[in-house]
Each structure stands twice: as C-alpha cells, then as structure tokens.
Amino acid sequence: MIERGKFRSLTLINWNGFFARTFDLDELVTTLSGGNGAGKSTTMAAFVTALIPDLTLLHFRNTTEAGATSGSRDKGLHGKLKAGVCYSMLDTINSRHQRVVVGVRLQQVAGRDRKVDIKPFAIQGLPMSVQPTQLVTETLNERQARVLPLNELKDKLEAMEGVQFKQFNSITDYHSLMFDLGIIARRLRSASDRSKFYRLIEASLYGGISSAITRSLRDYLLPENSGVRKAFQDMEAALRENRMTLEAIRVTQSDRDLFKHLISEATNYVAADYMRHANERRVHLDKALEFRRELHTSRQQLAAEQYKHVDMARELAEHNGAEGDLEADYQAASDHLNLVQTALRQQEKIERYEADLDELQIRLEEQNEVVAEAIERQEENEARAEAAELEVDELKSQLADYQQALDVQQTRAIQYNQAIAALNRAKELCHLPDLTADSAAEWLETFQAKELEATEKMLSLEQKMSMAQTAHSQFEQAYQLVVAINGPLARNEAWDVARELLREGVDQRHLAEQVQPLRMRLSELEQRLREQQEAERLLADFCKRQGKNFDIDELEALHQELEARIASLSDSVSNAREERMALRQEQEQLQSRIQSLMQRAPVWLAAQNSLNQLSEQCGEEFTSSQDVTEYLQQLLEREREAIVERDEVGARKNAVDEEIERLSQPGGSEDQRLNALAERFGGVLLSEIYDDVSLEDAPYFSALYGPSRHAIVVPDLSQVTEHLEGLTDCPEDLYLIEGDPQSFDDSVFSVDELEKAVVVKIADRQWRYSRFPEVPLFGRAARESRIESLHAEREVLSERFATLSFDVQKTQRLHQAFSRFIGSHLAVAFESDPEAEIRQLNSRRVELERALSNHENDNQQQRIQFEQAKEGVTALNRILPRLNLLADDSLADRVDEIRERLDEAQEAARFVQQFGNQLAKLEPIVSVLQSDPEQFEQLKEDYAYSQQMQRDARQQAFALTEVVQRRAHFSYSDSAEMLSGNSDLNEKLRERLEQAEAERTRAREALRGHAAQLSQYNQVLASLKSSYDTKKELLNDLQRELQDIGVRADSGAEERARIRRDELHAQLSNNRSRRNQLEKALTFCEAEMDNLTRKLRKLERDYFEMREQVVTAKAGWCAVMRMVKDNGVERRLHRRELAYLSADDLRSMSDKALGALRLAVADNEHLRDVLRMSEDPKRPERKIQFFVAVYQHLRERIRQDIIRTDDPVEAIEQMEIELSRLTEELTSREQKLAISSRSVANIIRKTIQREQNRIRMLNQGLQNVSFGQVNSVRLNVNVRETHAMLLDVLSEQHEQHQDLFNSNRLTFSEALAKLYQRLNPQIDMGQRTPQTIGEELLDYRNYLEMEVEVNRGSDGWLRAESGALSTGEAIGTGMSILVMVVQSWEDESRRLRGKDISPCRLLFLDEAARLDARSIATLFELCERLQMQLIIAAPENISPEKGTTYKLVRKVFLNTEHVHVVGLRGFAPQLPETLPGTDEAPSQAS
C-alpha cells in the first residue's frame, strides 16, 4: 500500500520571539498550547506563509476579525517578523520517501506601507542528519549566530553533493513542484486555484462553517469536466473552421480570376522592375569599367597636353618678355616722334605770335597818341558846353519871372563881384597885378601859347622816356635769356656768360647733327643682335625638346636624320590604319552576331524555363524531345494507378469515420435505440454502469458479459414485460438484466477466469467461453483508447488520401504542362544555348577592344614621334640660316660702343632742343648786355617835372579864360539904371537867350560827337591792349611748353623719329604674330586641357558616382537578393527572358502592371498600402515586399488544408479541381461533426449521475461524525428546475427547436443559450453573450445545487448555518466539510499525479478549546482514519495523552522577547476500537 506523505517539521528563523525554532510535527495531531500572545498564531502563520507565499491572499487576523474585508495594513505578516532576513521552512517526506524542504525567505521592506518581500525556494536530496536550522544559520560563538542570506544559502547548498536548490520567481512554479512531489493535494494552476486553497486553509485555521466555501461548494467538490467541455469546444471549433473553410472556398472560387490576375500582374510589376534593376546593375558595372578606362586614357592625354603646354608657355613667356621691351621701345619712339612733331608745331606758333606782337606794339603806340589828343579836346568841349548851359539857364530864369529878373539884377551885382574875384585870382595865378578885364583876352593868348609849349615839351620827354624804356627792355630780355640758360648770375657777368653759351651752343649743334647716323647704325646692330639672340633661343629650345645638347656643326647632319625618320614613321602610320580597319570590321561582325543571338535568347529562355519547370515537377532530366514524349506516356500510366489507390484509401477512411461515430455515442451505446429503450424501461445501460471501468479491466468485463454487454439493467423485470409486447424498434437481440443500477455488481454470473479468457456458466447445461478481445470496447476508457487509435489511423488515412489526391492532381497538371510544352517550346528547347555563345562572343569582343586600345596607344606614340620629328625639322629650318650670326661673338661689344656715342649725341640734341630758341634770340641782342642804361631814372624825373609845369600852365590859362568869360559881368555896374527900362531889358534877355541856346546846342553836338569818337578810340585801344596781352601770354606759354618738351625741332628730327618708330613697329608686329600663334596654340592647348580636365572631372565624378551607385546598388541589391532568397521567390522574379528587353520596355511593362494592380487591390487596405510604398523608385526592396505580401495574401486566402502547396501559382492551377472536391468533403464532415441535442442531454445527465454517486460515497464517510448535538453531516445535491427542464427538452422535444441547432449562423453553444432563453424568458441574462451562456450550460456543475445539512438533535436534518449551531458544532461541521473537500481534490488530481504518490493531508484549528472532549476525540479519530495531520492551538493542552504538545511561553529579557517552547509526546495507549460507525471509513475514503 502506498504510504501517505507527511510534514515532518516547521522551522521559523528570525520571527518575532523565534530566532531559530523547529517544531517537529506529529503524524496526527500537533497541539500548540499557551496563553494569549504566546506565539501560537505566529507559528501557524509561518506554516501558512510557507504553504501559500502569495501576498495578495495572506491576511492573518484574530477571530474577532473573521469575515472582515479589511484589517491592518500589513495583513498581519509584517509585525510577526524581525528586522533582517527571515525564513519559514517545511520539512516533508513524500510517498517515495524523498525528503523535500520547501520554504520562503521573508524580509521587511522599509517604508510606511509595511511591505514584506517573499522569495520561495525548495531543497531536494538533503540528508536526514541535516537539520533545517543548520542550513540557514551560521554559529559565530557559543551565544551568537547569524542568519544566512538567500544567496549564501544557495552557495552553501550547491557545495553539498547531491543537494538541489531551486529558487522560484513564480508562485505557480513553486506550487507545481509541491504538487508533483505530493506536498499539496491539488495542482494550483492559477490565482483562482490558489485563492480556493487559501480560503480552505483560512476556514480550517479560524474554524466554523466558512460561507466562502459553502457558497461555492460546486467549485470545491465537483471536478471540472474539462474533457466534455473540450470536446464541445473542439467540435465547435472544428465546425467553425469547417464553415470558415467552406466560406473561404466559396470566396476563393469567386476570386479565382482575381487571383490569377493579381499574381500575373504582380509578377509582371515586380519581375520587370527586378530584371530592370538587374540589367541596370550590369549596365552600371559596364559603365563604371568604361569610365575607369576612359579616366585612365584621359589622364594620359592630360599629362601629354600639360607637357606640351609647359613648353609653349615657356616660349610664350619669352616672347611676352621680348614684346614688352619692344612695346616700350616702340612706345618711346612713337612718343619721341610725337614730341618732335609737337615741337615743330610749337616753333611755328611762336614765330607767328612774335610777328603779330611786333605789329600790335606799333598799332598800340599810335592809338595811345590819338586817345590823348581826343581826351584834351573832350575836356575843352565839356567846359564850353557847361558855360553855355549855365548861360541858357540864367536867361531862362530871368525871362520866367520879372521879379526874378530883379533878383537877377541883384544876382548880377553878385556876379559882378564874382567877376572881380575871378580877375583878382587870375592876377594872382598869372602874377599880373595890372591885369584888367579888357587885357585879359590878350594875356589869355599868351598863356595859351605857354600852355602849348609846356605840352609839347612834356610830349617830347614822353617820347624820350619811351625810347629809354625800350632800350631797358632789350637789356632785361637778354639778361633773362642768359639766366634761363645758365641759371642766376650778376648783371655785370651777363656779357661773358652769354658769349660762352653761344660758343657752347655751336659745339652742341655739331654733336646733335650726328644723332641720326648713330641711331641708324645702332638700329642695324641691335637688329643683328636680336637675330643672334633669337637663333640662340631657338637652338636652346631645340636642344631642350630633343633632350640633348648639339653643337653648331652637328645641326645639318641631324636635319637629314630627322627627315629620314619622318619618312619611316609616315609609312608606319599608314600600315596601322589598315590594321585598325580590319579589327573594327571583325568587331562589327561580332556585334551583329551578338544582336541576332540576343533576339533568339528570350524564346530559348522561355522554352528552358518551361522545360526546367517540368524537370522540377517530375524530377527527371530531358535531353531530347523523345525523352519528353516517353515520359508523357509514363505519366498517363501513373495517373491511372494513383486514382485507383486514392479510391481505396477513401473507402477505408469512410469506414473508420463510421466506427468513430459509433464509438462516440454517449454511454457506450453503439445503437441509439438502446438509449431510448433504457429511458422507456426506467433502466440503465450496462455499458453506462461500467463506464468508469479501467482500461486494464476492460478486456475482462467485455469477455465476462459477452454479447450481453449492451444489456439494459432494470430494477424489476416484471415491470418491463408489458413494454416488450409489440416492440419492433429495437436490435435483433435485446438483453435485460435485473439489478440495482446504483449498486450493481457482477455476481449474477458464475465465472472461471482462464489465461486471457473466461468461462461463464450461464446455466447448469450452458456455458460460454469468451476470450479477452484484442481491442476491448467495454468502458469509457477502452472506447476512448480505441477512438484515439482510430483517430490516429484516420489522420494517417486522411493524410494519405490528401497525398494521393494531390498526386493525381499533380499528375494531371503535369500532363497539361507537358502538352503545352510540346505545342509551344519543343521545337527550340533542345537547341544550343545562345547565352553561352553570347558570352564567348563577348569575350572575343573584349579581346578585340583591348587589341584596338593597344593599337591606338601604339599609333598615338608613333604620331607623337612623327610630330616631334616634324617640329625638329621646322626648328632646324629656322636655325640653319642663322649659323653665321651664332658664330659672331663681338656683335654685343659693338652695340654697346655705338649706344654710348648715341647717348652723348642725344644729350647734345636735347641741349640744343631745350635752349636753341633762347640762344637764337640771345645772339642778335647780346651786344646790349655790354652797358646798363642807368640815366633812365633821371629821364623819368624830368618827365614828371614837365607834367607839373604843363598842369600849372593849364590852370593859368583856365583862370584867364574865366575872366574873359565873365567879361560881361563887369558891365553889371549899371544894373540900377536898367531897372527903369525893364521892357528893353526883357527884349535883350530874349535875344541873349536865343544866342545862348544856339551856342549851347553847338557845344552839345560838338561834345557828343567828340565823346563818341573818344569812346571808339578807347575801345580800339583796349582791344589792342587785350590782344597784345593775350598774345604775349600765349607766346610765353608756347615758349615754356617748348622748353618743357625738351626736343630739338630741326628739319630732320621728324624723319629720323618716324624711321625708328617704323622699324620698332615691324619688329613688334613680327613678335606679336609669333606670340599670337603661340597664344592661339596655347589657348587651343589650354582649351584642350580644360576640356580634358572637365572631361576628367566629369569622368571622375561619373566614375565615383557610378561606383558609389554600384556600391549602393550592390548593398540594396544584396538586400533585395537576400529578401528574394529568404522568401523563395527568385524563380518567379528572375525571368531571364526579360533581361533582353530595354529599360523603357521594362518600365512600361511595370507601369502597365502597376495600373492594373491599383485597380486589383483597391479594396484591400493592406495590399494597397504596401503597393503605394513599393512605388518609391529608390527602394526596390519594397516591390519585393509587395510581391511577398501578395504571395502571403494568396497563401492566406488559399488555405493549406485546401491546397497543399506553398506556391500560390501552383495553388491557382490546382484550385479549379480541388475546390469542388473539398466542398463535398467538408459538407459531409460538417454533418459528421454535428452532435445531436439528445446526445448532449445524455452526456450531461450521465455526468450528473456520476458526480451524485461520488458525493453519495463521500457522505457515507461523514454519516457517523458527531459534534455536540450534531449526529451526522451530509451534502445534498439537486438538479435545478430550469436546467432540468432544458435537459428534458433537449432529449424529448428537440424536434421543435431544430431551427436553432440546424442554423449555420449559430454555433451549438449559441443555439443552446437561445433555447435556454426561450424556455426561461423570465430570467435576466444581463450583458453576457449567447456564446458565454451556452458554454456555461455545457458545464454540468451549473445544473447542480449543493448545500451542507446536519442531523442535529430533535430538529432532524437541517441546513448547516453558523446561526443554528454552537461554536463547537460549527467548528466540527466546518472541519468535516474541509476534510471532504481535501479528499475530493485528491480523487480529482489522482490522474494528474504519479500513481506512486499519496499527497500530504494537513489542516489547522485555532482556539480549539471551544470544543468539548468528545468533539476533540472525534477530531483525533477523524485524523487517524483519514491519515490526516492536524495542528491545533489552545490556551492549555486539551488532550495531553495523544499526539504531540508544545507549551509556548513568551518571555521578555533585557528588552528582548523570546518564546520558551517545551514539547511533550502523547503517552496514552492505542484505542482498542474506533469510534462508532467508522469502521468502514478508511476503505471508503481510500
């Protein structure tokens, strides 16, 4: 017999009051006694924590908190621990005698939440001699020890041989190990299972009837019929999948054309782009190689051009330097010519202006005299006109007013006085005291003559003054000329210096006359010198180009050698041209052949693709058209054989399906009529009674009952007789057995068991021998075993049938493919490979291109040598005529000598040119420098004295003139007499007025005419002075300009300057012509270099871009290729025939396919998005992703259970035939999968009956349990009325509700829920879906109601409630219920655990002192009978004679709490007999 596992001990480490304490647990009852706060609850809490380390469930409270929903924040665990590492460990030994230590490491977490950290662990293989406290503590000294952390504990255990340490991160894993090793009774898979286990332990700990358990007894006691539910779920899943597959088939049938279109267009879209990129990659590689070759060639050309450019640039620099000198000389010669011409023009202007000045000087002197005379006459006329005007005014005034006339007389008297005053002034000025008015006229003539004499004398002195001034001016002019030529000097030295300057001027003129001959001689020598230098330069350049120095004597021989080389190179170039033409002709022929092969290649590739596909499909290699036709005949024969085998397998599969359906009938009935007869007779099928028989016993019982194993067991045969009359709907042989279905046994037969057989003695004269069947079908286990084997066989047959069907279809498809191949490609498929020939021709073409390139290089070198030879000959042609110049060494010295002489002559010419005019002017007037006219000042004084005398004479004459004019006023002495004769006076006044006016008019006209004449004279004088001053100033400016020019303006200077300029111009023109030639050549060379540089840069840029593009494309292409190979679509995309299309054709093909695809995937969001992303030309891998997505989409649409292939293209080819076959097969399968409502009702009823029988067996173990007034405890199981009605309708009236169960839109669960709602419209289903309700209705537990009843005193059987029982009675009743639950769990889990393990049983009971002695004894007896361990706690030892008792006393020493523990084993002898009514309990419990 299997021994039950036991808990050996409980170890607490570092708990409150327990530092390191191990409690050895009794095999039955362990009692913890002690006062309040002694540590009993802490000990039990440690046990529970090690058993269920789930902080979400643990809540340790005292009995006053029982049933409360909230408690202290730490759930009672934090306060029971000490600071630091704590342990709680359970030492167990299981049925296999394996020692297992399980436990938890606990540690308080700092914080106000008072949390605790828990780590579960397990130790296996620990020797019995090692105590748990030794593992987790380390002794420091005699009175100190240290608790080991978990990692040190792990290291310590790993060091021990044979010991296994496991730390768990999941409570599920921890409980799974405990279940497998037999420590707990049930596998706790989820938090819900742990919660049930904890509620059971909690109910046991605190005692009483737990409402949490009694309310959900179904979950605790009734096992979940997962097999039935899974069967229904599998059936519904199969039906759902079947219907979905049928729907998919219908959709696939409707989308078949779309599939073809989609795969065709997707292949065209992606393959065209794929091959275009492949072609572009090859083209880019070819371009990159071509760019690299061109780059190398261009670099060589650029280097040659650079060498050529350097040579020409050097020569151009030399010519530029020479041109600069020539330009400077030419510019100087031109400037000199311009200066000479300007000086000549200036000299002509000076001579012309000097003549004009002499003429103006004469005219100016004459005009001065005329103006002086006119001024004198003007003054006289002004005096006369003024006197006449005064006279007229007086007379007019007198005539105007007579009174005024009187006044005039008075005035005349005044005038008389004035006349007397004037006479006196004249006497004084003229020094004539005897002067009278009458003699004044005579004296006036005398003094006028005197005035005229003084005027003549003044004019004579003025003329002398002018002549002296002229002499003084000539001296100053000559003196200034000498100062201008020689510089400042004394006036007395002017004569000597002037003579010296005149002699020096003669010498300088003689030297200046030699300038032109010297200049001509120098020009001739300089020309020869330049030719000599040019010849030397040409020779040096030639030597540099030839890379060797040559003597003058070697040049003629070298000239002949170069001409011979030119002739030979010309012949070589001509021969190379003919060879190049031959190579190019061969290249063109190769190109033409390649083009023709490329046109034939796509047709051949298409034939090869078709041939390769056929070879891949059939696994054969075809070398000729005869092989193809022969294989086609073999294919037809194979197709016929496969069809025959497929039909045979299909028949066997149908037979297996029928047997599975027959064995799957509920209750083991192979005939549905037996179930109806059993219900009609009120009996039970014998197969249902033995439905739980084990697989090992099935052969025995099958042979025992033989043909009667399908009998119906009825309580009374006599009551069945009336039903047998007229019974027709039944099997041919119907067996009826009388017996109690609840307690039926096999005692109805007399049986002798033999080896694999039985002999059944039916009667004294009738025996039956039956062998054990090889495949027993009696009992659920046997049927399930047989069904399982049949399912396996059916799977094999289905797979074989599908394989054969696929082979048939494959063969048919191959036949069609061969037919198409023969019709389309057989003529060209076995021809030679055009691509291989193309590769050979391309290799030859590359060789030709390389030969052409080498030939071009050689020809280029010969051309360069030819050009170099021609340049050498040209250079020698220029050098050879100048050999005599190259031999003249004294030419440079002669040039220097002539240049020095020319410098002296030019210096003399510059002196003559600068001072020639001054010397010419000085030469005629040099004699005036001999004496200096000093009397000029005395003459100026005499002239001033004569002017004063002339003014005095003029005043005297004027005074006498005034006396003469006032001569009439002397007659005013008789003005008194004239007053009496006023009339006569008036006439006289009128006459006098007329005379006076006539005189005034004459005076005015004379004054006006003379004033106009004077004005004209003054204007002429001013004009002459202005002209004279202007021309004088211009003459001075011209003389200064001529001096500034510094050029001698002789007659031959202009001609010499012009000749020199023309010579330099000719030299400059020649130099410029050569320079222009060099510049053009250099510009052409630079342009060629620029073109080569730009070409080189472009080539470098193109090469690097192309290289980068190739590298980038390579990375992208590698990604594309990797994606293509990973997804296995290379065969579809790498269409070699597309490689011969142009990029535009491929792009057009891809664009057309893209347009068609946009329409095709318009309704598919995923494909539409992927297609839109694939349109990016920079991301070719996205097109592959689209193609893969299309394939994946097709794979999803064409399911593998319909079409067994991974290739959608092949699937489309198969689809036409396969879909119709699958439609028929799936339709029949759906009919087979569907389960009837009556079968469901029978299954649920049988399950309910089985569980009722099991509960009844459990009740038998509790019938004699008594606590106080409670005499017995039992579980009452009833079927709910609403659910019972549902079962009745399912079994009897299901035809009325076939609209629900035959609907394709509803699953069976949904139809069951709809039926339940139809039968119970008053029940509110809430928010639950029909599927959820239907799944609940398929669980038999929802059909049952369970409650606990007690037989208490006189009340009889009543519902067990805490309010109707005492505390002790409630504790005992609750403990009984818990024992029942534990036993039920063990029964349920027996099939999940090993057969050799019986799990530990342990419950708790706190505050057990509330039970009386009889109840305590009952508990002890219950533990002994059920082999259960019990831990109880009480203030005192309630039964010291049994079990093991621990006395706990909490003590405080030096602020440290410590629980003192004393253990005591029971000393009572074994009871002589068990409790009344419990003798059969162990057998029943087991």
Swiss-Prot record:
PANTHER family: CHROMOSOME PARTITION PROTEIN MUKB (PTHR42963), DUF4476 DOMAIN-CONTAINING PROTEIN (PTHR42963:SF1). This is Chromosome partition protein MukB. It is found in: Cytoplasm, Nucleoid. SUPFAM superfamilies: P-loop containing nucleoside triphosphate hydrolases. Signal peptide: none annotated. Its main location: cytoplasm. The hinge domain, which separates the large intramolecular coiled coil regions, allows the homodimerization, forming a V-shaped homodimer. The gene is mukB. InterPro entries: MukB, MukB/SMC, MukB_hinge, MukB_hinge_sf, MukB_N_dom, P-loop_NTPase. Gene3D superfamilies: 1.20.58.850, 3.40.1140.10, Immunoglobulin FC, subunit C (1.20.5.420), MukB, hinge domain (3.30.70.3500). Plays a central role in chromosome condensation, segregation and cell cycle progression. Functions as a homodimer, which is essential for chromosome partition. Involved in negative DNA supercoiling in vivo, and by this means organize and compact chromosomes. May achieve or facilitate chromosome segregation by condensation DNA from both sides of a centrally located replisome during cell division. One of its GO terms (cellular component) is nucleoid. Keywords: ATP-binding, Cell cycle, Cell division, Chromosome partition, Coiled coil, Cytoplasm, DNA condensation, DNA-binding, Nucleotide-binding. It holds the Pfam family MukB. Homodimerization via its hinge domain. Binds to DNA via its C-terminal region. Interacts, and probably forms a ternary complex, with MukE and MukF via its C-terminal region. The complex formation is stimulated by calcium or magnesium. Interacts with tubulin-related protein FtsZ. Residues 326-418, 444-480, 509-603, 835-923, 977-1115, 1209-1266 form a coiled coil.
